[in-house]
């Protein structure tokens, strides 16, 4: 969740006289662990029924009947809601993606002549399950003839070639649906002549492994570039002369906050580490040398745009690792009493505005290791360096002591910039004395 001390860009826009509206089917925002995000906007709309959304109230569903058409690997306790939800999603207009973009059209029809507004259209698709209307699925024929298989579990690939092709075809179908409805949004921009005074950003949160590196999904395995390198497309009327150009500067999602705040004429908080993208849009001016990313408890990763360095702790043990929060909720649940019983207060970080936080032991798996979102142990957890210029698929780690030392030093600098707790440096073996 957003912490009390977190800077929220829609909240800052709202407090400076702007208006923010979000349209989403992203049901995680309405669970424990996400419930402080959507209320930062002036108004919000949610479309129900995506994936495992707790949507329909059926006390005794006939799961034997409902699940009989699904691949056995797809029948898990947590997919129950999805199977129930699909019994109510029969026609294209029942899917959340068309509904979301329809609501976006409604917002634009009402507000296109107004000024100083932000519309966030957050579509859960093409997230799993890769369930799309039949007309999109027909565009990607394959030889698979089994039960419905459009939700691969986060695990190593051990499916047949036909099953793999089926999952990928379903992914292609749902992506095509998103593409078509995004195109309808662009048509609405044409219809309302919004290109003259309205900026548009297209991006996402993460990628997904569809068998690359012999994995499905995310979270458990290393953060390969298929997961970390995400699309970013920006239109702004001030830079329309540069339309269609590619940019090569290294950027991160954190750069969107200062960028959007700058466009609204709102001051950028001092805690912000992202950089405005205005100069990137204008002339592809570099705004950072490196970007740091990763999963809590796993590797700390860094890239300079060419090399990607994934540095794991020597031991994945959760000993000496802590979580810091004033909002003790996890993904879909509250912290348990057992998790909080030994909590202590930790001094403020440089981003908490002078406020202390609870210091809590992290989740552990049965082996005492920090766990991946309650999914178990991190896998393939060894440090590696890739040269993505010569090896864009990250198939073969390289040895280059000079590059590794440079990126380790930059990782240390970045962690200091973000005021990472001391135990992180020790855990990763990059204490200052290393240099």
PLM regions: where:
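C-terminal, low-complexity/hydrophilic appendages and adjacent surface loops
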Residues: 225, 296-399, 435
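Active-site regions of oxyanion-processing enzymes, predominantly non-cytosolic
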Residues: 33-45, 76-85, 89-144, 192-199, ...
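Short catalytic/ligand-binding loop motif for oxyanion handling, primarily in non-cytosolic enzymes
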Residues: 21-22, 28-33, 52-55, 116, ...
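Polar, surface-exposed loop/tail segments
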Residues: 29, 93, 101, 196-198, ...
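A long, amphipathic alpha-helix that forms part
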Residues: 94-112, 151-200, 263
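A short beta-strand-to-alpha-helix junction
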Residues: 2-6, 165-177, 219-228, 241-258, ...
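Histidine-centered active-site microenvironments of extracellular/periplasmic hydrolases
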Residues: 129-144, 188-252, 288
């Amino acid at each position: 969740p957003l912490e009390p001390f977190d800077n929220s860009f829609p909240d800052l826009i709202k407090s400076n006289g702007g208006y923010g509206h979000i349209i989403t089917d992203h049901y995680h925002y309405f669970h424990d662990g996400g419930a402080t995000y959507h209320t930062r906007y002036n108004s919000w709309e949610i479309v129900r029924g995506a994936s495992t959304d707790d949507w329909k109230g059926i006390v005794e569903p006939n799961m034997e009947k409902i699940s009989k058409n699904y691949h056995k690997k797809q029948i898990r306790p947590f997919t129950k809601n999805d199977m129930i939800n699909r019994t109510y999603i029969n026609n294209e207009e029942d899917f959340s993606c068309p509904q979301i973009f329809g609501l976006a059209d409604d917002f634009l029809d009402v507000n296109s002549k107004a000024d100083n507004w932000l519309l966030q259209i957050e579509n859960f698709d093409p997230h799993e399950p890769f369930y799309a209307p039949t007309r999109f699925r027909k565009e990607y024929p394959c030889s698979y003839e089994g039960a419905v298989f459009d939700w691969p579990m986060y695990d190593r690939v051990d499916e047949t070639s036909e099953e793999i092709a089926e999952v990928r075809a379903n992914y292609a179908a749902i992506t095509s649906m998103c593409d078509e409805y995004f195109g309808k949004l662009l048509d609405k921009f044409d219809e309302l002549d919004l290109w003259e005074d309205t900026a548009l950003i297209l991006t996402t949160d993460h990628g997904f492994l569809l068998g690359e590196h012999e994995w499905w999904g995310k979270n458990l395995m290393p953060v390969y570039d298929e997961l970390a390198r995400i699309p970013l497309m920006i239109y702004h009327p001030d830079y329309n002369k540069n339309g269609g150009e590619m940019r090569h500067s290294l950027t991160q999602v954190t750069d969107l906050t200062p960028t959007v705040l700058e466009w609204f004429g709102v001051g950028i908080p001092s805690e912000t580490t992202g950089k405005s993208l205005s100069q990137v849009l204008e002339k592809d001016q570099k705004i950072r040398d490196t970007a740091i990313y990763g999963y809590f408890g796993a590797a700390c990763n860094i890239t300079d745009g060419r090399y990607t360095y994934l540095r794991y702790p020597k031991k994945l043990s959760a000993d000496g690792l802590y979580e810091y929060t004033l909002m003790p909720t996890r993904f879909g649940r509250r912290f348990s009493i057992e998790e909080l019983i030994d909590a202590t207060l930790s001094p403020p970080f440089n981003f908490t505005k002078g406020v202390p936080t609870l210091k809590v032991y992290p989740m552990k798996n049965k082996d005492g290791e920090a766990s991946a979102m309650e999914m178990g142990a991190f896998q393939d957890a060894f440090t590696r360096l890739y040269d993505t210029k010569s090896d864009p698929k990250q198939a073969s780690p390289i040895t280059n002591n000079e590059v590794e030392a440079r990126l380790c030093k930059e990782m240390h600098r970045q962690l200091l910039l973000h005021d990472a707790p001391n135990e992180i440096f020790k855990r990763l073996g990059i204490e200052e004395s290393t240099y």
